[in-house]
From Swiss-Prot:
Lineage: Bacteria, Pseudomonadati, Pseudomonadota, Alphaproteobacteria, Rickettsiales
Keyword Cytoplasm among record annotations: no
SUPFAM superfamilies the record matches: Translation proteins SH3-like domain
Protein name per the record: Large ribosomal subunit protein uL24
SMART domains: KOW (SM00739)
């Protein structure tokens, strides 16, 4: 299993595949499969049959995509960037955009 540099709520962009260029927030992370669900990306329609518990119909939902197909969005420039880890003076470990040096995620807010 590889070290994931993504967290729920991160802003990402799809860099390969049929959804290339789409931006969204990470809704859920599956570390065991190295996949994530991104809002508005890889949306499919699922037809469901009615039963005693729920009505039938068409449901739209997002399917997971592999983390190698996404890149973080640099908070300073808005362009795709790679992520590095850095230790601050107080000893805390944060994620940093390699292009601009800005802190990524909730740690930077």
């Amino acid at each position: 299993m590889i070290k994931l540099k993504v967290k729920k709520g991160d802003e990402v962009v799809v860099i390969t595949g049929k959804h290339k260029g789409k931006k969204g927030k990470i809704l859920k992370v599956f570390p065991e499969d190295s996949k994530v669900i991104v809002s508005g990306v890889n949306v499919v329609k699922k037809h469901t049959k009615s039963n005693q518990m729920s009505e039938g119909g068409i449901i739209t939902k997002e399917l997971p995509i592999h983390i190698s197909n996404i890149a973080h969005i640099d908070p300073k420039t808005g362009n795709p960037t790679k992520v590095a880890f850095k230790f601050l003076e107080d000893g805390s470990k944060v994620r940093v955009a390699k292009k601009s040096g800005e802190i990524i995620g909730k740690e930077g807010k």
